[in-house]
UniProtKB/Swiss-Prot annotation:
<dbReference type="InterPro" id="IPR023574">
    <property type="entry name" value="Ribosomal_uL4_dom_sf"/>
</dbReference>
<comment type="function">
    <text>One of the primary rRNA binding proteins, this protein initially binds near the 5'-end of the 23S rRNA. It is important during the early stages of 50S assembly. It makes multiple contacts with different domains of the 23S rRNA in the assembled 50S subunit and ribosome.</text>
</comment>
<comment type="similarity">
    <text>Belongs to the universal ribosomal protein uL4 family.</text>
</comment>
<dbReference type="InterPro" id="IPR013005">
    <property type="entry name" value="Ribosomal_uL4-like"/>
</dbReference>
<comment type="function">
    <text>Forms part of the polypeptide exit tunnel.</text>
</comment>
<feature type="region of interest" description="Disordered">
    <location>
        <begin position="46"/>
        <end position="72"/>
    </location>
</feature>
<dbReference type="GO" id="GO:0005840">
    <property type="term" value="C:ribosome"/>
</dbReference>
<feature type="compositionally biased region" description="Gly residues">
    <location>
        <begin position="56"/>
        <end position="71"/>
    </location>
</feature>
<keyword id="KW-0689">Ribosomal protein</keyword>
<keyword id="KW-0687">Ribonucleoprotein</keyword>
<keyword id="KW-0699">rRNA-binding</keyword>
<dbReference type="GO" id="GO:0006412">
    <property type="term" value="P:translation"/>
</dbReference>
<dbReference type="GO" id="GO:1990904">
    <property type="term" value="C:ribonucleoprotein complex"/>
</dbReference>
<comment type="subunit">
    <text>Part of the 50S ribosomal subunit.</text>
</comment>
<protein>
    <recommendedName>
        <fullName>Large ribosomal subunit protein uL4</fullName>
    </recommendedName>
</protein>
<dbReference type="Pfam" id="PF00573">
    <property type="entry name" value="Ribosomal_L4"/>
</dbReference>
<keyword id="KW-0694">RNA-binding</keyword>
Length: 215
């Protein structure tokens, strides 16, 4: 059974916690479907080209049908002319969103967590809170403290997951390129797959792994 690594306040390993048994044997195809759903939902349908009906001009026949030695033409909006309409061009009426049901979303999230745990890249800490130093009635050195926390993990990049994240913690990590801090309500399988390691607050971890199959 896969286990998440439990870290102490100094981010040193002090134990482990098992993932629920239902996380085992989940088909990886659920994660593939969720990633396609996530990326397609984020796609902006802005590409647009004009067809021959939308191009301006072309109200009269450019030259006589016969006698000129040239191929017949009825309008300069034809796709064969420079400046004419585009054949089979992009339209902004296509919906790229791919639907996925609630169960598949849950299975994708559970599979992604299981993968991180098997790779020893899933960590649990008691609290993720950056307070900084108060100077002149202002909180300073927030990013410095957040970077020290990230460096102590010795990971390539890290996703931090909090429960009821405060504004100082969010600000502290916002300037770090290889880190992202989110509230547990924003957690999804795509983010879990995108980052090489995940650090979760204990409360956030318990919130995620509780059985939601009967909800």
């Amino acid at each position: 059974m896969s286990k998440a690594i439990v870290l102490d306040s100094h981010l040193k390993e002090k134990g482990s916690v098992e993932l629920p048994k239902r996380y085992e044997g989940i088909n990886s195809h659920n994660l593939y479907l969720y990633v396609k759903h996530y990326l397609s939902s984020a796609r902006a349908n802005t590409a647009k080209s004009k067809n021959r009906a939308e191009v301006s001009g072309g109200g009269r026949k450019p030259w006589a049908q016969k006698g000129g030695g040239r191929a017949r033409a009825g309008s300069i909006t034809s796709p064969v002319f420079v400046g004419g309409g585009v054949s089979h061009g992009a339209t902004n009426k296509r919906n790229y969103n791919l639907k996925i049901n609630k169960k598949q979303k849950r299975l994708a999230l559970e599979y992604a967590l299981e993968e991180k745990a098997q790779a020893n890249k899933l960590f649990v800490v008691e609290k993720i809170a950056i307070k900084g130093v108060v100077e002149d009635n202002k909180r300073k050195h927030l990013t410095k403290e957040a970077n020290q926390m990230f460096q102590a993990l010795e990971q390539r990049d890290t996703l931090f997951v909090c429960l009821n994240m405060d504004e100082y913690t969010e600000l502290a990590f916002s300037n770090l390129k290889k880190c992202l801090v989110i509230d547990v309500s924003e957690l999804n399988a795509y983010l879990l797959a995108a980052f090489s390691s995940v650090v979760m607050e204990e409360a956030a971890f318990q919130h995620v792994v509780q059985d939601k199959t009967e909800e």
